[in-house]
A protein has these predicted regions:
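Short, solvent-exposed charged binding patches
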Residues: 60-76
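Amphipathic, hydrophobic secondary-structure cores in small proteins
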Residues: 5, 9-63
Length: 76
C-alpha cells in the first residue's frame, strides 16, 4: 500500500505525516486504547524522538514497540 498523508496538530502547530494505511489503523487503535487523540499521542512521540528520526519513523517505531510489549505480556 502507498503511504497516506494526514495532518496532525502538535502543540498548536500543523504538520503532515505520511504512513501506510496499516500504520494509520494501528496508530488510531493505540490512541483509542489509551483514551487519547492522535494529536496528543503524536505530540508525545514527537517530544521523545531524537533529531535523527523523522516523525513518521518515530510513530512506526512506537507502534512496533507497543505491539511487541503487548505480545510479550501475553506470552508470560
Amino acid at each position: 500500500m502507498r503511504p497516506e498523508k494526514h495532518s496532525l496538530t502538535l502543540r498548536g502547530h500543523r504538520t503532515s505525516v505520511s504512513l501506510e494505511p496499516e500504520f494509520w489503523q494501528a496508530f488510531r487503535a493505540l490512541a483509542a486504547a489509551e483514551g487519547r487523540g492522535l494529536n496528543e499521542l503524536a505530540a508525545e512521540i514527537d517530544a521523545g524522538r531524537g533529531a535523527e528520526r523523522g516523525l513518521a519513523s518515530a510513530i512506526r517505531v512506537h507502534i512496533l514497540e507497543r505491539l511487541t510489549r503487548a505480545r510479550d505480556a501475553v506470552g508470560r
